[in-house]
UniProtKB/Swiss-Prot annotation:
This protein's UniProt keywords: Aminoacyl-tRNA synthetase, ATP-binding, Cytoplasm, Ligase, Metal-binding, Nucleotide-binding, Protein biosynthesis, Zinc
Cofactor: binding details: Binds 1 zinc ion per subunit.
EC numbers, comma separated: 6.1.1.10
Binding residues for ATP: T332
GO biological process: methionyl-tRNA aminoacylation
Record field: catalytic activity: tRNA(Met) + L-methionine + ATP = L-methionyl-tRNA(Met) + AMP + diphosphate
CC cofactor: Zn(2+)
Family matches, as PROSITE patterns: AA_TRNA_LIGASE_I (PS00178)
GO CC entries: cytosol
Motif placement: 'HIGH' region: 10-20
Role according to the record: Is required not only for elongation of protein synthesis but also for the initiation of all mRNA translation through initiator tRNA(fMet) aminoacylation.
The protein, known as: Methionine--tRNA ligase
Source organism of this protein record: Bacillus mycoides (strain KBAB4)
Amino acid sequence: MSIFIGGAWPYANGSLHLGHIASLLPGDILARYYRAKGEHVLYVSGSDCNGTPITIRAKQEGVTVKEIADKYHEEFERCFRSLGFTYDCYTRTDSEHHHETVQKVFLRLLEEGYIYKKVVEQAYCETCTQFLPDRYVEGICPHCHEAARGDQCDACSAILDPLDLLEKKCKLCGSTPSVQETEHFYFALHKFQQQIKEAVEIAKQKGTWRDNAIQLTERYLKEGLQDRAVSRDLPIGVPIPVAGYEDKKIYVWIEAVTGYYSASKHWVEETGKDDQEFWDKEAKTYYVHGKDNIPFHSIIWPAVLLGIGEEAIPRHIVSNEYLTVEKRKLSTSKNWAVWVPDILERYNPDSIRYFLTVNAPENRDTDFSWREFIYSHNSELLGAYGNFVNRTLKFIEKYYGGTVPKGSIDVELKDKVEGLYKSVGEAIEQTKFKVALETIFDAVRFANKYFDEKQPWKQREDDPVSCEETIYNCVYLIANFAQLLEPFLPFSSERVRNTLSSVKVNWEPQNTLPNRIDNVQPLFERIDVKQIEHEVEKLYGAVK
C-alpha cells in the first residue's frame, strides 16, 4: 500500500510553539506506524518562506527576508529532529525546485482553463506606496465582528477579501488604505463545486475527515465556492510565469499547498525513486494540520489536483482543533505560548509527545497546563510504563545475572497482545490517536497488576519455576510495548529495544525474546513538582 502523509508548512517567521506540534504530531505517528507495517510511506513538509508574515518580520527587525527564513527554517529542522519527526523530505518554499514545480502547476491550470485574468479593486497604501496583499490588511470581520486578517477570520473561519473588512488598516504603517484597480489571475474554484461535494460525501460516509473539516467545507459548498485570486503584488514569492506579469507573484491559495507536490518531486530528485504511486487514486493520503488550514486542504488543494489531472485528492483530513495554554488562548504577539526550543531544553521529547497525544485537540480545544504535563509524566510515563519496565529488568539483573529466564508465553497474555496490535492499529488508521495510546496504557496498567499479583519476589523463594514464567511473560509484554509505543514514544521504545537487543521495528507480536539484557537504566526520571510553579511564573513573566 502507498501512504502519502503531508504535514502543514509552518511560517518561518518565528519559533514553533506547542500549538504547532499538537497539530503536526499525528503525521509522524502515522508515518512510523505504516513503516512498521512495511507499507511504502512518503511523509513530507517544509517551511513556508514566502509568506507575508516573513516579510513583515524582516521589516520589523531590519534584516533581509532570507535571513529570517534561514534562521527559522534551520531552527524548525532542529526542533522536528529533536522531537523525533521522521520526514522523508522537509524542504522550503523559497527553493528553486519549489518555484519550478509551482510554476508548472500554474501553467497547467492556465492551459486547462481553470485560471483566468480579471481587473479588480485592491487595497492600496498611499503611505507605503504599494498594493497590499491580503495579510497586509487588518480590521474587523464583517461576519462575527472580531479582529481579523484580510484573508481569513480565525474567530469564525470565514474566508475573506481584504475589502470586506471593517475599519481596515495597513499592517505595516497603520494608515487606512485606499482602493485602486489592478489586474490579477483568478482560480475558477466554482468549476469544482460538484466534485468537492462528492468528495465530502464520501468522507462523511467513511469517517475519513474530521468533523470540523466536513462541517466547514459543507458551509462553503452551501454558500457556493467563490473564485479566488491566485496572484498578488508581493515583494517575494514565486513569479507568475506569464510574459508581462513577472512582477506579480503566485498567491498562497495555490502556492503553499502545492508544496506537498514540490516536496514529493524534490524527494524524487534526492533519492532517484518514483513518486507516482503516491499520486495514484489508490494511494492512501493523510493531510495533517490545524483547523485554520481546513479550506486549503478540503477545497483548494483538491481543486488544484483535479485541475492538473492528479487523482490522489485528500482521503484523510486530520484537522485538529486548537491548543490553549493555562486556559488562555495561545497568542504569539503577547508571548503567551510554550515555545518548542525552550521546552526541549528541559524535558524529555517522549513526555511532550505523550502529553500532546493523550491530550490532543482531536475534536475540541484542549489545554496545556504545566501541572497536568508534569503530573502525567510522573504518573503515566514514570509511574506506570517506566516502573513496569524497570522493575522487571532490574529483577532479571539482580536475581538472574542479566540472563532472561526460560518460559512459555501465557495464552491469555498472547491473545491480549495480538488484540492490541489489531485495535491500536485500527485506531491509528482512523486517526484516533488518543484512543490508540490510551489503549496501550490500559495494557501497561494491566501488566503492572499482573506483576503485583504474581509476586515474583515471593515466587522466587516458594516456586522458582513459576517465577521464571512470570518474568519471562513480563519481558514478552515489554518487548511488545516497545513495538506498540514506537509511533508515539520513539526514544524510550528504542532504548527498550536496545536493552533487549531487538533492533527491528515491525507491527506484529514479538514472540522471540532475548537471552540476555544489558545496561538497564531508568526510562524516565521523576520531574520535581516544584517545577510547576517555576514554569507558570516564567510563562506569566514573559507576557508582553
